[in-house]
């Protein structure tokens, strides 16, 4: 869950530069021992989340903290929450100022940036026994090959979901609602039919992002995680399919700038046939778009291989005065029982080992929401965190979007557009490495 925006694209390099320059102040090489003990569970630490202090989650976290403090009487956990807007910028600013909280909620992209500047604790070294407590794919998602193979976050929750389709719209546009697409080839073929039969509606309203390339079967980086490679022939093939669809007017110009919120709005309005979503999406459509909900069909996430999933983690500040407490609290929040409770409340999926086997994720009670959850659980078992942690959600994502847009508009070839995007990202990695 990473905020985006053009302003962040402009400042991303500056932020990392300031972090690297300040690393001598905040202990960037992690060689100076913190003041507290590595194992002592006592003292006061700050725990930071983003966009979670609200009517839905406040009581959960208050109870969680109270239970931990009761089990560990010489501890105090101060919980702070930040708004989603500008969250990653604030993380970078706090890290540069030496005021990053002890335990922080973030995804792999933000963690990679801070770990690159030496701000985060390498849990592979500081807490190697923790690895077995989590799904291997989740632990590996927080293990950064490009930074020497260190692991920089305790895995927390995962998210993926099905594809939602408007059956009424499919039938109107000469498509069979009983034959939903499951691969990108099928999706593009059906989108082309829609473009011919229903010029005022569309199948797709989102530009390809880096995870789309992964799901399509494109190699995103080299084996060492130091060079991006998504400009290979398979990557060109993917964007060519979008270009062909755009030429057929199956993807209008507005889609070149669409954010996810616009895509959801179009689906709820009955003008879009396909929406990638999550377990949360079903109830949202039921409550806010009942006319679309009654004609809803649900299929697996579109993929040519392994579907995508997202991961959130809890990282530990390498300069925490109480590293033992910080590690203990982060592992407490992410233990199986607490992950299960949070997943039930937030409509997400646990990363703790064995928790997906709980009946909540496996037993069907006949409710449509339960069916979606069970199918998504099966998808989690096969899913991959396709977004490379070294791929900046601001600078790299914006560059990729802009280059693809130029290719779709005919201002440059698809190959030259992807070459430019890959060159930009690789130059940024080299400059910051």
Identify the meaning behind each predicted range.
Residues 124-137, 180-182, 196-197, 218-240, ...:
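Short, solvent-exposed loop/beta-turn-alpha elements that line the ligand-binding surface or hinge
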Residues 66, 70, 171-173, 248, ...:
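Extracytoplasmic/periplasmic substrate-recognition and gating elements
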Residues 70, 145-208, 221-256, 318-324, ...:
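Helix-loop-helix "hinge/cap" segment bordering the ligand-binding cleft or interdomain interface
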Residues 81-90, 109, 182-188, 254-268:
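Short helix-initiation/N-cap motifs at beta->coil->alpha
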Residues 102-105, 273-278:
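Paired acidic/hydrophobic, glycine-rich loop segments that form the ligand-binding mouth/hinge
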Residues 108-160, 295-297:
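Hinge/lid segment of periplasmic solute-binding proteins
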Residues 372-421:
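C-terminal capping/gating helix-and-loop segments adjacent to ligand/active sites or protein-protein/ligand interfaces
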Residues 2-113, 132, 177, 325, ...:
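Conserved N-terminal structural module of periplasmic/extracytoplasmic solute-binding proteins
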């Amino acid at each position: 869950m990473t905020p985006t925006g053009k302003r962040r694209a402009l400042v991303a390099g500056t932020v990392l530069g300031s972090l690297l320059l300040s690393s001598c102040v905040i202990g960037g090489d992690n060689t100076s021992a913190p003041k507290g003990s590595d194992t002592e569970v006592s003292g006061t630490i700050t725990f930071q989340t983003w966009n979670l202090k609200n009517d839905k989650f406040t009581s959960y976290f208050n109870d969680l903290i109270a239970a931990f403090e009761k089990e560990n009487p010489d501890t105090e956990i101060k919980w702070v929450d930040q708004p989603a807007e500008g969250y990653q910028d604030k993380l970078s600013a706090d890290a540069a100022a030496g005021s990053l909280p002890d335990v922080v909620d973030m995804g792999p992209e933000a963690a990679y940036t801070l770990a690159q500047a030496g701000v985060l604790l390498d849990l592979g070294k500081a807490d190697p026994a923790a690895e077995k407590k989590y799904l291997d794919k989740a632990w590996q998602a927080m293990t950064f090959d490009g930074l020497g193979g260190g692991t920089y976050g305790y895995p927390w929750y995962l998210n993926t979901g099905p594809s939602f389709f408007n059956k009424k719209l499919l039938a109107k546009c000469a498509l069979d609602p009983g034959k939903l697409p499951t691969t990108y080839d099928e999706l593009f073929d059906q989108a082309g039919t829609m473009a011919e039969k229903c010029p005022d509606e569309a199948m797709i309203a989102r530009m390809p992002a880096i995870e789309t390339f992964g799901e399509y079967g494109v190699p995103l980086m080299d084996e060492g995680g130091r060079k991006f490679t998504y400009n290979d022939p398979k990557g060109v093939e993917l964007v060519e399919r979008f270009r062909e669809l755009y030429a057929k007017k199956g993807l209008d110009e507005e889609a070149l700038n669409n954010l996810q919120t616009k895509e959801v709005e179009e689906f709820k309005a009955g003008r879009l046939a396909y929406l990638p979503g999550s377990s949360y999406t079903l109830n949202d459509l039921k409550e806010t778009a009942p006319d679309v909900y009654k004609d809803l069909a649900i299929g697996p996430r579109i993929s040519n291989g392994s579907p995508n999933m997202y991961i959130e983690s809890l990282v530990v500040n390498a300069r925490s005065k109480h590293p033992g407490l910080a590690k203990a609290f982060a592992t407490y929040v992410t233990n199986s029982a607490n992950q299960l409770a949070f997943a039930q409340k937030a409509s997400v999926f646990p990363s703790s080992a064995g928790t997906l086997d709980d009946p909540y994720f496996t037993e069907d009670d006949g409710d449509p929401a339960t069916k979606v959850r069970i199918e998504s659980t099966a998808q989690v078992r096969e899913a991959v965190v396709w977004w490379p942690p070294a791929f900046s959600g601001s600078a790299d994502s914006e560059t990729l979007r802009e280059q693809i847009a130029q290719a779709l508009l005919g201002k440059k070839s698809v190959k030259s557009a992807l070459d430019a995007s890959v060159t930009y990202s690789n130059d940024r990695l080299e400059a910051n490495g």
